Amino acid sequence: MTVEKTKTNPNNTIAFQGELGANSHMACMEARPNFEVLPCHSFEDMLAAVQEKRAIAAMVPVENSVAGRVADIHHLLPDSGLFIVDEHFQRVNAMLLGIKGAKVEQLTEIHSHVHALGQSRKLLREISARAVQHPD
């Protein structure tokens, strides 16, 4: 299911997997600042948005320099009929957020995206918090 936040012009729209504010959204805004964005629920929905001409392109994460390959894309892209036509490198800075007054040493669980957890594995080991995966 694709989530459309606003009416978009498909010829000036770039689709991405995730919510507004996700790393892929930031990459879209940096790489194509004059494009409208189309947030999609899944990688399949993102690719379908281009196949169905609801977007002219998709910002597709293929690799994370710390956490490695984005495996789902490497399985989906070959059968999509789509091709890589450009490349963008997105710098990502992770931050640990908590409620006011929370102390790092009291944390028992950290909820985040699988790749963000992978990038933070040293911190997670240091504070002995359990990693809980979320889509975004």
Segments and roles (model prediction):
Residues M1-D136:
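Domain-level signature for soluble enzymes in the chorismate/prephenate branch of the shikimate pathway
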